[in-house]
Structures are given as structure tokens and as C-alpha cells.
Design a protein with these regions (language model features):
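Membrane-helix interface motif
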Residues: 225, 229, 235, 269-275, ...
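Soluble extramembrane regions of membrane proteins in the secretory/endomembrane system
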Residues: 1-245
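Alpha-helical transmembrane segments and their helix-start/interface "positive-inside/aromatic belt" motifs
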Residues: 244-255, 288-307, 378-383
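Juxtamembrane interface at the cytosolic side of transmembrane helices
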Residues: 257-303
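Cytoplasmic juxtamembrane interface segments
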Residues: 181-192, 276-287, 363-377
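Alpha-helical transmembrane segments of integral membrane proteins
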Residues: 300-384
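Membrane-interface segments at the starts/ends of alpha-helical transmembrane spans
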Residues: 239-251, 289-291, 328-346
Length: 384
């Protein structure tokens, strides 16, 4: 993109508790096709700061609203400000819906075109309500996984809950831009309704995948690429099934596996250096094999500990809401601000304490009498 040949701009917003790397695949594919792409960390996620608002999705789009305003005000002379879009998955999809509503209201108030020309909503339909859709002045594509495990929250129940052909959420999205005489009772998936020129274009997709796999699915990615090709026109047109993002994921996986494999060889290499020679120790003698009683105790402790871990998680979630009330209500606070991680922290601390108690009791009641040497635990530290 250059100032002489401006390109459409697309903001990408990841889902809940995700950093920008989670949607790098769609960023790669959109940028290959010549769009200007900004992949952000939502507020309070990744490297982004927190928001003072407890309604960061509605009022700020998790940071997307400010970005759209910044771009629209001419911060980048190579961006076509008449072609600004947003896309996101899950919580990021909600941000896209909220963006269509926010900038739509702004356009109505100022009697202007919406700054957010088009949005693509992936994996989220809970806020596709009349009070939000009615003010939208953006083209809108909706993609929802047919086997989305969160569909139980939708308006329909059972198997129909994720069926976007008959879902009230998708019907409202489409019928809201159609004349009363042309309104439909069943959505034709992949069909474009409305008018691009009037910013009322609508399309619904319903890919047969699970919610977390939707951003990593060739069909879902292709549908999104086709949508932006339809509303903006790609500066560098490429077939939507010509995708390379999976190579990045494959090599990232290989990199992770190799990093784990290399831990022991690299540790041995460092231990061969003179600087680390003082920490080398002889391999201790193996412990005696467990007898029948020892095996019973071992497996009993294993299953009891696992059971305690299972049944204590939900209570720890409830306790976290009480101990960290500000964080639980999304208020910005210095006192343990990560509301989702606070529950895990309490659960881990409680089960760690239970584990220490069980471990100590098993040693005192059984291990000590059967030749278990505490030195074999590797907990002792000698002064240099």
C-alpha cells in the first residue's frame, strides 16, 4: 500500500484470554492479499494495558474503537479510510458486533457514513440482538461453528442451538436489512443479502467445526477471505483456498518439540563446562522396588489427590469471587487483577498444600519405616 494506491484497513481482535498470536493466521492471509492489517492484544490481554471500564467490549471494543478512530483520522496515508473493517473470533467477534453498533450510532447522530465500513463476526452470536443490530451501518458477515460447544447459551436449544439456518440470531441479522415483504424464515448459508452500497450486506456461514478450531480451519478462513474480497476488493487477489498459515503453525510446533528435546542435551553440555562442574553429583542409588502394600498406598494417594483436585476447582472459583471482588467484577485493581487466573491460583495453592500434607503423612506413616531416605528427594541445599 502507498499513498498513491491506498488499501483497505482491517483490525483483528482475538478472543477471551488470548494474545494477538492466536489470530496471526488470518492476519497472514489478509496481508498476503494486500490489506493493511492491525492485529491487536485486547485490553488486559497480551501486552495491552487494562481498561478502566467494566464494559470494555460495549464502550471500547477491547481497544478496537480507538484504533479505528486513529486510522480514520488519517494516521496512515496509505489507508483508504472509506474501507475500514474489523474482524474477531469469540470475544473478538463480540467486539466487531459492538463496533458496528457504536460507529453506526455515531454515523446516525452525525448524518455521515459509518467509519467502520464492514465487520466479520466469528464464533459469537449472543449480541446479535435487535437493540444492537438496528443501528448498524456496517456490512456484516457472521461465521458460527456448527458444533460450537458454547451454543447452549444461544436462543435455540439442543441440536438446533448452533444451526445458523434457523437460529433467531442469524435471522435477525439478515431480516433487519430486508423489506418486510422479502424477509425470510430460513437463511441460505453463504448467500449475500442486502446491499454493499448501502452498507447493509449480510452473509451467514456455519462451518462444521468446534469453536476453538474455527480460526484454524481452511473453510472458515476461506469464507472470511471471500467476504472481505466481496466488500472491499483485495488489492492483491489470491484464491481464498490458497493459504499458507498452516506452515507457520507446523514449524512453530516443530520448534516447540525441538526446544523440549534439546533440554537434556543442552543441560549435559553446560554441566561439562568448568563453571558448572561444582553442581555435578553422582546419580543416587535407585529406591527399592515397591512391594504390594507400597503399590496400594501409591495408587490410593494418586486417586485421592486427583479426586480432591477435581472436586475443589469450582469451590475455588466461588471463593476467588469473594476474595478478589474487584477483579471478579472487571474493575481495574492492583490486588490480583487477573480474574480468570485467580481461581486457578487458589486451586493450585490449596491442592499444593493438600499434596504436602498427604506426602508428609505417607512418609511418616509408611516411607520412614520402609527405608525411604529424604536425601533421595533432592530437596537439600549445601552451602558452597
Amino acid at each position: 500500500a502507498k499513498s498513491e494506491s491506498k488499501a483497505p484497513f482491517i483490525a483483528i481482535i482475538p478472543g477471551f484470554q488470548r494474545s494477538k498470536e492466536a489470530l496471526s493466521n488470518i492476519a497472514i492471509e489478509l496481508s498476503r492479499r494486500g490489506y493493511v492489517v492491525a492485529l491487536i492484544d485486547p485490553y488486559a490481554q497480551g501486552l495491552s494495558s487494562s481498561s478502566l471500564s467494566t464494559r470494555a467490549a460495549t464502550t471500547q471494543g477491547y481497544g478496537m474503537f480507538a484504533l479505528v478512530e486513529h486510522v480514520y483520522d488519517g494516521a496512515f496515508n496509505f489507508v483508504d479510510i472509506d474501507k475500514i473493517g474489523a474482524t474477531g473470533h469469540s470475544m473478538g467477534g463480540n467486539a466487531a458486533i459492538r463496533g458496528a453498533d457504536f460507529f453506526g450510532k455515531q454515523a446516525i447522530q452525525n448524518n455521515t457514513k459509518s467509519k467502520l465500513d464492514s465487520v466479520y463476526v466469528s464464533g459469537y452470536v449472543l449480541t446479535l440482538r435487535n437493540n444492537i443490530l438496528r443501528d448498524s451501518k456496517s456490512n456484516m458477515g457472521v461465521s458460527y461453528a456448527l458444533y460450537d460447544e458454547g451454543a447452549f447459551r444461544n436462543e435455540l436449544t439442543a441440536w438446533d442451538s448452533a444451526n445458523m439456518m434457523i437460529a433467531p440470531e442469524s435471522l435477525r441479522t439478515v431480516n433487519g436489512v430486508l423489506p418486510k415483504a422479502e424477509q425470510i424464515k430460513k437463511v441460505e448459508l453463504g448467500k449475500y443479502y442486502g446491499s454493499k452500497e448501502k452498507n447493509s450486506l449480510r452473509v451467514i456461514f456455519n462451518e462444521p467445526v468446534l469453536h476453538p478450531f474455527q480460526p484454524y480451519n481452511f473453510e472458515a478462513t476461506s469464507n472470511q477471505l471471500d467476504y472481505f474480497e466481496k466488500v472491499f476488493g483485495a488489492p492483491n487477489p489470491i484464491n481464498s483456498y490458497n493459504q499458507i498459515w498452516h506452515w507457520k503453525e507446523i514449524f512453530t510446533l516443530i520448534n516447540m518439540v525441538l526446544a523440549l528435546i534439546m533440554l537434556i542435551p543442552i543441560a549435559r553440555l553446560f554441566l561439562g563446562l568448568r563453571f558448572f562442574s561444582s553442581i555435578k553429583k553422582d546419580v543416587p542409588a535407585p529406591l527399592n522396588a515397591l512391594n504390594k502394600k507400597g503399590k496400594i498406598i501409591f495408587w490410593s494417594i494418586f486417586f485421592i489427590s486427583a479426586l480432591i483436585a477435581c472436586v475443589t476447582f469450582i469451590p475455588m472459583v466461588e471463593i476467588a469471587k469473594i476474595l478478589f471482588a474487584d477483579a471478579a467484577s472487571r474493575k481495574l485493581t492492583w490486588f490480583f487483577p487477573q480474574r480468570m487466573n485467580n481461581s486457578v491460583m487458589l486451586w493450585a495453592a490449596f491442592n499444593g498444600l493438600v499434596g504436602i500434607i498427604i506426602f508428609s503423612l505417607s512418609y511418616k506413616l509408611f516411607g520412614k519405616k520402609n527405608g525411604v531416605d529424604p536425601k533421595s528427594w533432592g530437596l537439600g541445599i549445601n552451602r558452597m
